[in-house]
Amino acid sequence: LVGGDTVQGHLSITITICGKAPDKEVLKRTTAEPNDMIFVSGTLGDGRAALSLIQQKKCVSERLLYRFYCPQPMIDLGVELRNLVSSCIDISDGLVSDLTHICNASKVSAVLDVSNLPVHEEVKQLFPDDFAEFGLYGGDDYQLCFTAPESEKAKIINAGMRSNSRITPIGRIVKSMGSNKVMLEGMDVNENISG
């Protein structure tokens, strides 16, 4: 397996953790269903915003630096969600990329409402023309993207509060549209916002 940890350098440390869980408590990519709501935790685009500022040698706030260099895995939230959601993935490569993994594995498509993307106000102010692109395509956020029946929405919001995590509904799973795509208001995301 070749991934994001394959870089040129003098030292590479790879850690693998294995464990067991009851089958009904495993968060999978393969079990999203049409009509499920799509949710994300936290805010999106912070990692991409921080990287852009660092590359431009501009001042970066402590909040963005912390989000970029010290991402926090959403373990507590994942535990809270395990009996509520139909599918789940962490957002490491960007929302569209990672949600596409769910769509492909579950043989469904997704429709996103970009106006609901939870992008932090700081990122919106710093990048007024790019914040939606950062939220859709920026990586290194390590938030969770998950799907669930609408009947579970209140329980999911409560699970977010118990784990101190903001939860935002951002779209809906639909039947596969020929190829398993992530769509924006009925159009291919890549036709609307370049990433």
What does each model-identified segment do?
Residues Q8, K28-R29, V40, D46, ...:
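Generic structural "secondary-structure junction" signal
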Residues V2-L53, R172:
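Glycine-rich anion-binding loops of enzyme active sites
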Residues V2, P22-L27, M74-I75, V96-L99, ...:
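Glycine-rich, charged/polar anion/phosphate-binding loops
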Residues V7-L11, C18, N83-L84, C88-G195:
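Glycine-/charge-enriched secondary-structure boundary and capping motifs
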Residues A50-L53, K57-Q72:
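A short, charged helix-loop
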Residues V26, L77, K155-A159:
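Hydrophobic side chains in well-ordered alpha-helices
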Residues M37, T43, A50-L53, E80-N83, ...:
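Alpha-helical scaffold segments in soluble metabolic enzymes
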Residues D36-G42, C70-L95:
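Internal active-site segments that recognize and position negatively charged phosphoryl groups
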